[in-house]
């Protein structure tokens, strides 16, 4: 009895209300789920007593416990009768490896006779009998409690204390929820009141037995679904199957042990999820029924521990699989959290078990235990994705690279597309295509040779492949296996097997013969049947073809093949079915890449062995380098190189330096000075080439808007070098928004100290005065980067100038019409500039006036070329683009900002340099460029004539970089 006093006393609720339906169902569900992982003896609580006078249970040994994968042993007659007369649910439930069945107590014959006599004599239900026999049961419990306290004294006390505390906490949360939502959750009595009401209802209806009919029980309460704990436990492997835990004696309060501190909060999450995803997820329990069961501990236990995984549709699965990496990391970390972790989201739509593990429906497609040999799949977006062994993350398909482009890099598919599938338009009617037009099935009768049917690709094999290979897998040989794999010309008839007609070549599987444009076959290789992989390779260098079987080379089958051949496969008897692989998947024959490397080496050795007929390569290369340096006006470098190689100049050195100066002016944006030097040094060049002059003028107009050629306003001024700002404002906008400062300097001087922005990278264009102290347009400073227009005075530079207002590129875009429309728009802008009458504004206005005047002159020049029919479409577009820059307050960020890029000056300088050399009777291009262009053209000609070597030659091979 001392051991009984040490153990915590059983609650009055549990002792007096042993047959309460809520506690009984919760205890029964707990015994089914095996959440505690221990054996539950039927005599540990009066709510689980199935006989009036149970005997003390005998602890079962590890050998007596049944294996979790095998069913429980059949019950004897006494146990069957006791369960039929018991008010508790004994419907069959699935057994999992976490829980071992409770040991059954033997029932003697006198006890059975005594129980039958009591049932015949007494009319009250079994509940009253059990209440009357409770003192005897308490006496029988004492030895069992002594044993429990001896084995687990401290653990049992701590567990019961935690259980009682959690149970009262959950009951308080449930009452608080009912008070907040009186409409959604109807008021229900507390645990004590419901148990009292249960006894009163039983006493009021003594004639109605509470014994359930075993035939109706499965319909009234179906077996519970799989537990998340069970599935989570099965993931750990099969080594836990034989592990046995010591038996624990659990009373009615133990049902709260599987409910953690977040149980009620997670129950609320289930209801919130039902409201949010009602259209895309199916919930097993009705929401109204669930709300009515939340107030009971059994309902909370069922909702928390036994959760049916909903079936997600493909529409709802897609957005969840596209979560970012942060969500993936968060979901991965949640798998290692315990049951008290508060990092779980309330709005999650996944399911969490009692130990904090994260589950989703994708992880368990079928509720079958996974074997220990199954490897775990990675989680993506909180869901487990099952990968197939065939899919490799290192394959080109997963890296976003076309494998055919890697296999045939020299093929230009815009001109000669690669065969990638069978053509649905170039086939016989008896042929059926499926699986992206890669699977071929015969659908004819197949009685005669005329019943043969073939299919080919939509495009022929490009000769620029050099070496082309494809494979065909025999899915089924059909009735007779009359199949042919080969090559055909475009005019091949599709009711014949490849090889029977002219310009068709095939390898047949029924006899292993090769057919070359004839009905008479030649002995070639073995036959092939279901499961074999047949490959066909075409060599465009020597115009041969060979076949492979299951990765083994069978030797050359055909020679002297024509060009433009199509991959073809032919079938003849019912049931024949094949799959094609044109390079999308790895080949069975893995020596294609090595063969291509060997052929490439042979072609390069052939080029190196070609005899040099003219002179030694050293002298030829020296002349090529010298002419290239002279052509591009690298005067100092050319002079040093010719002195080292003992070569002479064909052009005067002074002419080379003049061209060099003009090229530098163009590259720095000083178009007006470049044009002036060209007219002075090479008279008659621009006058006789009006199109070139017009192109230079268009570029000059662009540089004026850019601010690099402001000296065009006055020919006596020069400008320093420019930089390319990222947010430059046009000269037009700067002059329109110019404001004169009212600073108290007295002399009207200005300060240009604020000439750079935060990036400190731009250098302003300074206009230097050439005479006179009066401020004029030549005394203007335009800061291209800081959007300031500053007046410069030769006496002092101390007075600050207000910065011009910065405008975004939100100006109205004007349509690029003809030249007259552009001139009218320029006139309108010119009239607008007359509004500002301040002296400084007039100076800035003169700048824009000069730009507009130059634009009118350029427009007139374009009209003159139009009259003489000398204007090309390229020059017409150039003029429209240049005039369109006026419409933007920030030309750099406009759609035409590429015109202001310094790289656009190179083409203008190259054109002018070539024109100058041509006027001096020199070549427009250096000889080195001619050689490179000639070699490129020869490679194209080789490909056009289907010689095959072009697949293994590039410009870098002919002219190596090192």
Curated annotation (Swiss-Prot):
Residues 655-712 form the CTLH domain. It is found in: Cytoplasm; Membrane; Nucleus. Disruption phenotype: Lack of isoform D causes an increase in niche cell size and abnormal terminal filament organization. This in turn increases niche capacity by increasing the potential contact surface between CpCs and stem cells. Lack of isoform C causes defects in the organization of the follicle cell layer and defects in dorsal appendage morphogenesis. Gene3D superfamilies: 2.60.120.920. Residues 146-164, 236-245, 351-360, 368-378, 389-398 have a biased composition (Polar residues). SMART domains: CRA (SM00757), CTLH (SM00668), SPRY (SM00449). Residues 271-284 have a biased composition (Acidic residues). Residues 1-33, 41-52, 118-132, 321-343, 806-820 have a biased composition (Low complexity). It comes from the Eukaryota. Residues 617-649 form the LisH domain. GO terms for molecular function: small GTPase binding. Residues 80-91, 165-202 have a biased composition (Basic and acidic residues). Expressed in the GSCs and in dividing cysts. Expression is reduced in the germline as individual egg chambers are formed. Isoform C is expressed in all somatic and germline cells of the ovary. Isoform D is expressed in the GSC niche. One of its GO terms (cellular component) is nucleus. Keywords: Cytoplasm, Membrane, Nucleus, Phosphoprotein. Belongs to the RANBP9/10 family. May be involved in JAK/STAT signaling. Isoform D is required for the proper arrangement of niche cells and is autonomously required for proper niche cell size, isoform C negatively regulates the adhesive properties of the niche. The germline stem cell (GSC) niche in ovaries is made up of two somatic cell types: 8-9 cells in a single-filed array make up the terminal filament (TF), and a tight cluster of 5 or 6 cap cells (CpC). This is Ran-binding proteins 9/10 homolog. It comes from Drosophila melanogaster. The lineage of its organism: Eukaryota, Metazoa, Ecdysozoa, Arthropoda, Hexapoda.
């Amino acid at each position: 009895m001392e051991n009984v006093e040490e153990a915590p006393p059983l609650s009055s609720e549990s002792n007096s209300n042993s047959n309460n339906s809520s506690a009984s169902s919760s205890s029964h569900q707990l015994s089914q789920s095996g959440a505690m992982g221990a054996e539950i003896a039927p005599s540990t609580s009066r709510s689980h007593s199935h006989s009036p006078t149970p005997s003390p249970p005998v602890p079962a040994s590890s050998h007596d416990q049944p294996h979790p994968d095998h069913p429980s042993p059949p019950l004897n007659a006494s146990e069957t009768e006791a369960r039929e007369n018991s008010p508790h649910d004994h419907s069959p439930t699935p057994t999992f490896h976490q829980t071992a069945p409770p040991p059954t107590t033997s029932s003697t014959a006198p006890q059975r006779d005594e129980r039958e006599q009591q049932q015949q004599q007494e009319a009250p239900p079994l509940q009253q009998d059990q209440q009357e026999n409770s003192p005897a049961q308490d006496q029988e419990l004492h030895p069992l409690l002594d044993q429990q306290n001896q084995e687990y004294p401290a653990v049992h006390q701590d567990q019961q204390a935690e259980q009682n505390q959690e149970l009262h906490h959950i009951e308080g949360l449930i009452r608080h929820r009912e008070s907040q939502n009186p409409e959604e959750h109807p008021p229900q009595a507390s645990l004590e009141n419901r148990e009292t009401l249960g006894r009163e209802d039983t006493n009021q209806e003594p004639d109605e037995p509470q014994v359930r009919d075993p035939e109706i029980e499965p319909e009234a309460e179906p077996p519970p679904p799989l537990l998340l704990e069970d599935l989570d436990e099965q993931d750990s492997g099969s080594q836990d199957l034989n592990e046995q835990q010591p038996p624990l004696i659990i009373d009615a309060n133990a049902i709260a042990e599987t409910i953690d501190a977040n149980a009620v909060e997670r129950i609320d999450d289930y209801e919130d999820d039902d409201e949010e995803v009602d259209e895309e997820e199916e919930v097993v329990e009705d929401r109204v029924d669930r709300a009515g069961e939340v107030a009971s501990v059994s309902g909370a236990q069922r909702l928390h521990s036994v959760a049916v995984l909903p079936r997600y549709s493909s529409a709802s699965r897609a957005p969840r699989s596209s979560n970012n990496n942060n969500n993936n990391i968060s979901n991965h970390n949640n798998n290692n959290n315990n049951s008290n972790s508060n990092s779980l989201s309330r709005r999650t739509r996944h399911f969490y078990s009692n130990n904090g593990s994260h589950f989703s429906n994708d992880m368990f497609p079928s509720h079958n235990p996974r074997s220990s040999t199954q490897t775990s799949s990675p989680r993506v977006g909180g869901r487990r994705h099952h990968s197939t062994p065939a899919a490799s993350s290192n394959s080109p398909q997963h890296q976003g690279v076309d494998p055919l482009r890697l296999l045939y890099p020299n093929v230009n598919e815009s001109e000669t597309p690669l065969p990638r599938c069978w053509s649905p338009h170039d086939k016989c009617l008896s042929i059926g295509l499926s699986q992206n037009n890669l699977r071929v099935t015969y659908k004819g009768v197949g009685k005669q040779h005329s019943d043969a049917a073939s299919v080919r690709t939509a495009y022929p094999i490009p000769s620029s492949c050099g070496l082309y290979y494809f494979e065909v897998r025999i899915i089924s040989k059909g009735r007779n296996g009359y199949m042919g794999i080969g090559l055909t010309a475009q005019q091949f008839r599709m009711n014949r097997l490849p090889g029977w007609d002219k310009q068709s070549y095939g390898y047949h599987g029924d006899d292993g013969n090769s057919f070359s444009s004839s009905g008479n076959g030649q002995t070639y290789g073995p036959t092939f049947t279901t499961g074999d992989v047949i490959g066909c390779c075409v060599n465009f260098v020597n115009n041969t073809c060979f076949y492979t079987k299951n990765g083994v080379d069978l030797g050359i089958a055909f020679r002297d093949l024509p060009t433009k051949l199509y991959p073809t496969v032919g079938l003849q008897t019912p049931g024949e079915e094949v799959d094609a692989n044109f390079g999308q998947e790895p080949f069975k024959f893995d020596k294609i890449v090595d063969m291509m490397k060997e052929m490439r080496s042979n072609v390069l050795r052939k080029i190196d062995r070609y005899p040099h007929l003219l002179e030694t390569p050293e002298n030829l290369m020296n002349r090529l380098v010298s002419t290239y340096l002279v052509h591009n006006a690298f005067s100092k470098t050319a002079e040093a190189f010719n002195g080292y190689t003992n070569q002479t100049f064909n052009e005067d050195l002074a002419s080379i330096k003049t061209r060099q100066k003009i090229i530098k002016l163009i590259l720095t944006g000083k178009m007006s000075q470049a044009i002036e030097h060209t007219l002075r040094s090479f008279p008659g060049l621009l006058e006789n080439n009006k199109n070139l002059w017009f192109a230079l003028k268009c570029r000059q107009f662009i540089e004026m808007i850019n601010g690099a050629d402001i000296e065009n306003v006055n020919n006596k001024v020069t400008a320093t070098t420019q930089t390319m700002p990222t947010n430059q404002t046009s000269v037009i906008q700067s002059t329109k928004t110019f404001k004169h400062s009212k600073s108290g300097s007295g002399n009207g001087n200005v300060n240009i100290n604020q000439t750079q922005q935060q990036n400190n990278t731009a250098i302003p264009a300074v206009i230097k005065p050439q005479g006179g102290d009066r401020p004029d347009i030549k005394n203007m400073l335009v800061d291209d980067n800081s959007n300031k227009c500053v007046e410069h005075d030769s006496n002092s530079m101390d007075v600050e100038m207000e910065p011009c207002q910065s405008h975004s590129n939100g100006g109205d875009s004007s349509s690029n019409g003809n030249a007259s429309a552009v001139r009218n728009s320029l006139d309108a802008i010119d009239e607008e500039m007359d509004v500002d009458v301040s002296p400084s504004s007039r100076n800035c206005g003169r700048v824009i006036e000069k730009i507009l005047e130059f634009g009118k002159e350029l427009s007139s020049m374009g009209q003159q070329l139009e009259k003489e029919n000398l204007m090309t479409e390229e020059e017409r577009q150039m003029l429209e683009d240049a005039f369109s820059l006026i419409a933007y307050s920030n030309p750099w960020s406009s759609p035409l900002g590429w015109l202001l890029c310094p790289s656009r000056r190179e083409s203008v300088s190259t054109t002018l340099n070539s024109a100058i050399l041509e006027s001096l009777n020199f070549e427009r291009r250096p000889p080195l460029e001619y050689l490179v262009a000639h070699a490129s053209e020869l490679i194209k000609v080789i490909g056009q004539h289907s010689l095959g070597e072009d697949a293994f030659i590039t410009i870098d091979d002919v002219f190596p970089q090192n």
